């Protein structure tokens, strides 16, 4: 993730949060650009990736000159941008009780992302 932010001279902070049912997930908060901290003048935006993905989807450098990833464009426009991750992807492999080797760790579905993961991040934002 760090290299994708560095390519665009953006600064960020990883933010760990724990869900009500014990999963610890790392998401990312865009904090600034080459000019310094971003002045937040607009609403917060939580960007949520698709199935099988992670938050890097919103900071990918697109082909061609002059293209800026959506997350960076929103941040530079004054939004407070948060890149959300869910349990089970590479940024959500921790649990209070279970390890990724335990069958119980993987006993979740998409409903859990909306019932537990997203509300836990919203509490942080």
Show where each model-derived region lies.
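Short interface patches used for recognition in eukaryotic signaling and trafficking proteins
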Residues: 10-11, 56-58, 102-108
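Alpha/beta-hydrolase active-site loop
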Residues: 103-125
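Secondary-structure junction/capping motif
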Residues: 1-4, 65-70, 109
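Short, surface-exposed "cap/lid" segments of acyl-processing enzymes
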Residues: 19, 24-26, 30-99
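Aromatic-acidic/polar surface patches that form glycan- and anion
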Residues: 6, 20, 111-114
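An N-terminal hydrophobic leader/cap segment in hydrolases
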Residues: 1-18, 28-30, 40
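Amphipathic, alpha-helical segments enriched in basic
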Residues: 2-5, 96-100
């Amino acid at each position: 993730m760090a290299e994708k932010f560095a390519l665009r001279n953006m600064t960020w902070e990883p933010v760990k949060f724990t869900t009500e049912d014990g999963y610890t997930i790392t998401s990312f908060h865009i904090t600034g650009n080459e000019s310094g901290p971003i002045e937040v003048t607009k609403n917060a935006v939580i960007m949520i990736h698709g199935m099988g993905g992670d938050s890097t989807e919103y900071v990918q450098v697109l082909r061609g000159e002059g293209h800026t990833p959506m997350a960076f464009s929103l941040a530079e426009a004054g939004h407070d941008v948060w890149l959300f991750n869910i349990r089970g992807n590479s940024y959500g492999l921790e649990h209070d009780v279970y390890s990724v080797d335990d069958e119980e760790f993987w006993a979740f579905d998409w409903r859990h992302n909306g019932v537990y993961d997203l509300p836990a991040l919203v509490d942080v934002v």
